[in-house]
Curated annotation (Swiss-Prot):
Family according to the record: Belongs to the methyltransferase superfamily. RlmI family.
GO CC terms, sorted: cytoplasm
Highest taxon above the source species: Bacteria
Domain PUA: residue ranges: 9-88
InterPro entries xref list: PUA, PUA-like_sf, PUA_sf, RLMI, RlmI-like_PUA, SAM-dep_methyl-trfase, SAM-dependent_MTases_sf
Function: Specifically methylates the cytosine at position 1962 (m5C1962) of 23S rRNA.
UniProt GO molecular function: RNA binding; rRNA (cytosine) methyltransferase activity
EC number: 2.1.1.191
UniProt keyword terms in alphabetical order: Cytoplasm, Methyltransferase, RNA-binding, rRNA processing, S-adenosyl-L-methionine, Transferase
The name this protein goes by in its record: Ribosomal RNA large subunit methyltransferase I
Catalytic activities: cytidine(1962) in 23S rRNA + S-adenosyl-L-methionine = 5-methylcytidine(1962) in 23S rRNA + S-adenosyl-L-homocysteine + H(+)
Species annotation: Salmonella typhimurium (strain LT2 / SGSC1412 / ATCC 700720)
Localization per record: Cytoplasm
SUPFAM superfamilies (UniProt xref): PUA domain-like, S-adenosyl-L-methionine-dependent methyltransferases
UniProt gene name: rlmI
Amino acid sequence: MTESTFPQYPRLVLSKGREKSLLRRHPWVFSGAVSRLEGKANLGETIDIVDHQGKWLARGAWSPASQIRARVWTFDKAESIDIAFFTRRLRQAQQWRDWLAKKDGLDSYRLIAGESDGLPGVTIDRFGHFLVLQLLSAGAEYQRAALISALQTCYPDCAIYDRSDVAVRKKEGMALTQGPVTGELPPALLPIEEHGMKLLVDIQGGHKTGYYLDQRDSRLATRRYVENQRVLNCFSYTGGFAVSALMGGCRQVVSVDTSQDALDIARQNVELNQLDLSKAEFVRDDVFKLLRAYREHGEKFDVIIMDPPKFVENKSQLMGACRGYKDINMLAIQLLNPGGILLTFSCSGLMTSDLFQKIIADAAIDAGRDVQFIEQFRQAADHPVIATYPEGLYLKGFACRVM
């Protein structure tokens, strides 16, 4: 496409000196960096981003209601945002997933991990021949038709299901959406395979897109710690860690969650893998409350898995989240036998690995126990983190030996 025929986009002009992050190819423009918008742009529409002197920097999506005023689609001035653009991005992402799927024997994985795959606000998980789509930004929603067309080109045999029913959309002025887009409706529970486990996924009603694919490697790593051990699996959801613990030869695993539906699926997952159901206990309760009750009754465990939901959504909540993480890890440490293992995680993007490690150290001091950090975890390799967007590393975890 020549310069004369290239689409003319509205221009977002940055204040003087506020272009540095874009020059380092960070994909966000915050409201404080914006001087003005030249031309009219609807919510999610494509805009050009320029410095205060008019020098072109990037092309992105406009979101006037968000603190993130623009999310960058491309740093290539010659690249138009159209079906061909999304097709290229999908095929680039698929190359890595193809290698992973073949290497690890996967039938389910994250196909698109937002900014780290060059598609800000777009999450796509593949479960067998179902593609589960989440559009989390105004730009992603604006380009919905182009993205779906590209998906149909790249994956003609796959059904597409929309799970854009997440509250973060409201921050950018968008309604929540859910339902089939193309192809058949997913079954109530779809079986997938992961590291030798068969697991049932609730695409339509489960958390996020139905299953936490990002913890795949952590679930596998659990097996090395659990042989002949008594395991407590907190915030168990549908039992991925529990099934992995049983496959690792644990003596007992107690799974705790507030959702009876999730616990019912966890039980089915144990049965589906033909594991000893008598070694699995399922408890519907609040984890904080139950841990305190266990402490009062002198219960002890050899391994505790702590995989809570996100405690922090924004910086104003960070201090409160730190207290929550410290309290719950302190309780877990108190329940472990000497030499026991704590596998603890945080999926809060604002919680850095260094801060999380400090919180665990503080929790150990409050519990009156010494702790050794023996292994570190992050999201699985189908959730890459592009170097210019460190915020993409949201999941972090540690294996800790409690003395």
